Amino acid sequence: MLLEFADLDNWVKKRGSILFKKFKYEPFTLEEADKALKEEGIEAENTKELLSILRRKEIIIAKKDPKDKRKRLYQFVKSAKKPTKDNLIRNLKYCADLIRTSVDYKVLLVFLFYKAISDKYLALVEKFVSEGYSKTQAYLMANRSYLTLYDEDEGKLYVWHEIVKSRETIMELANALNKIANLNDNLKDLSKLVEVLGLIGFINEDNMHILEELVRVYNEMDFSEIDYDAIGDAYQWILSYFAPQKCKEGEVYTPVEVVRLIVNLLDIEKDSEVLDPACGSGTMLIESYRYVKDNYGGEIYLYGQERNEIMAILAKLNLILHGVDSEEYEIYIGDSLKNPKIWRGEVDYTIANPPWNLDGYNEDVLKENPDVRRIYNTFVRGGYPPKQSADWAWVQLMLYFARKKVGIVLDSGALFRGGKEKKIRKEIVEKDLIEAIILLPEKLFYNVTAPGIVMILNKNKPEERKGKILFINASLEFEKHPEVRRLNRLGEENIDKIVDVYENWEDIEGFSRVVDLEEIRKNDYNLNVSLYVFPVEEKEDIDLRKELEEFKEIEKKEKEVLDEVIGYVEGILRAGS
C-alpha cells in the first residue's frame, strides 16, 4: 500500500497511512476514521476531503452501509501485482494521439477488446494446464467457461498472439475477428463492426505504419491479471477521449459522473432487471451492474436497446470487458420509441439519457403500431409529444416498462414548455409519479453547454413522499473538468451531497425543497427547478467591532508613516537652510 500513497500530498499520505494501519482491508465508517485520526493526535476536520481524495485515486472504495443506507462504508483496495490503470491509460493516450484523424477511433476499442479477451483466455488455459489437463482439453474448457477462441474443427487458436505473428497482420486480424464472431453467438454482430471499420481498407502506405505501431503498443499490454473494472475503464476512457469530436458528429456520450449520480439515486437492488432504451455504448447498464455488485453483491440482469447498430455492438464489447456474463445481458438493435423489443412489466428500473429534443415522433408516427399506441395512452390519454421533441415520449416509455423507478436525463426545457408537453406533464404530475427533479450544472455535456436535469419517477412512493416532489438545485455543484478546459464535471462530494438530500428528503435553503402538488398546480404545472429553489448567495458575516478596530489600526499606521515622512522632509529643509 506504500506505493499507492507515494504520489500523494504529505498530509494525505500521513493520514491515509494511519487509516490503513488501523483498518487494513476491513470496512470502516467516516466516524471511525475521525476517531482513528484523533487517537493519533490529528484533528479530523478534513476527514471527508481525505476520503474523497483516496476514492479518486482508487486507493479506497465506498459503498452503502447495509445496516443504514444513509451511511457509507469505506474499504482499502487490495493491491495486486499487475499493471495499473494509469499505465493502461497512458498507452491508450499515445495510441489515440497516434491515430487522431487518420483511423477511426473504434479501431482502438476493437484492438483493446481482442487483446484483452485473448489474454484472459490464455490465462484460463494456463490455469487448466497447471491442473493437469492437456492443451487441447484446456482450450475446450476455456471455450466453455469464457469465450470460444479455439476452433475445434480446424484445431486452430484465434488469439491475438497467434494472429499478429503473421506478415499480413491487419488482414489476419480482420479475418480472426470475423471468425470469433462466427464462433460466439453473443458476438455475431462483431463482423458488422469489422466491415464498417474497413480494417482491410486501411492497408495502404499512408496508414500501414500507424496500424503497425498500434499493434506494437498493444503487444506490450498484458491484460491477463488486470481486473475487469480496470479494462472496462480503459474502454470507457477511449469513448470519453473522443467524445468531444464524436458528439459534434451526432453521437451521444453521457459523462460517467452523471450516470453514477442516477444509479445512486435509484439505489438499484440485487436481483433486479434494468433497461436502458437508449443505451449507446452501455455506460448506464455497466454502472448499474457495478453498483449492485459493490453494494449488495447480488445478481442483476441488463437490457439495452440502441437504434445505432454500431453503438449497440460497442455496448456488447463494453459489457464483456467489464466482466458481465453473456447470460446477464441482452442488447437489442432498433428504435425504442417506435419498436421496443421488450414488453410491459419486464424490468424493475429504467434508466437513460435519450437524445434531447429528438424530432419526428408525433402522433402520426407513434400510433401506427397498436402495441406502441398503448404505451402513449397508458398514463396520458393521447399522450403523443409534439413533432419537435420526443422528451415526454421517453418518459412515458420508461414508465411503461418499469415496475419500480425511472431515472432519466432531459433538457431542462421539458420542465416548462407548453402545448402537448404541458398536457403530458400535467397528467404525470397528477398521477403522483414524479419523486425528484435535479437541476444539473451547465457545461457537463460535450455536445451542449445548457444544463440538463435528472428526473426520478417512482411507481411506489413511500407514504411520506406522496403528493410531493423534491426539487434540488445543484447548478453550483461542480468542479472544473481535469482534461477538457471548457467543461465542468460532478465531483464525488457533489454526487454524495445530492444523493444524501434525496435519501433524507429534506429542505436546505438555496439547495433543496419538498414541494406540495398544490403549489405546482398554482404554477400551472411548471416544473422549472429555479421556480422552487434558487441558490442563495453566500452572505459574509461582518463583525463591526472587529472591522472598526482594524480600521483604527490601519489609520494609526498611516499616521505613523505620515509623521515619519514629514519628519524626514523637515530634516532635509533644516539641513539646507
From Swiss-Prot:
GO biological process: DNA restriction-modification system; methylation
Sites where the protein binds S-adenosyl-L-methionine: E251, V252, Y253, T254, P255, V256, S281, G282, T283, E306, D335, S336
Alphabetical keyword list: DNA-binding, Methyltransferase, Restriction system, S-adenosyl-L-methionine, Transferase
Transferase in keyword set: yes
Reaction(s) this enzyme catalyzes, per UniProt: a 2'-deoxyadenosine in DNA + S-adenosyl-L-methionine = an N(6)-methyl-2'-deoxyadenosine in DNA + S-adenosyl-L-homocysteine + H(+)
EC number: 2.1.1.72
GO molecular function, one term: N-methyltransferase activity
Cross-referenced Pfam families: N6_Mtase (PF02384)
SUPFAM superfamilies found in the cross-reference section: S-adenosyl-L-methionine-dependent methyltransferases
Function: The subtype gamma methyltransferase (M) subunit of a type I restriction enzyme. In the presence of the R subunit the complex can also act as an endonuclease, binding to the same target sequence but cutting the DNA some distance from this site. Whether the DNA is cut or modified depends on the methylation state of the target sequence. When the target site is unmodified, the DNA is cut.
Additional note from the record: Type I restriction and modification enzymes are complex, multifunctional systems which require ATP, S-adenosyl methionine and Mg(2+) as cofactors and, in addition to their endonucleolytic and methylase activities, are potent DNA-dependent ATPases.
Family, similarity comment: Belongs to the N4/N6-methyltransferase family.
Subunit-structure text: The type I restriction/modification system is composed of three polypeptides R, M and S.
Protein name (database record): Type I restriction enzyme MjaVII methylase subunit
Species name: Methanocaldococcus jannaschii (strain ATCC 43067 / DSM 2661 / JAL-1 / JCM 10045 / NBRC 100440)
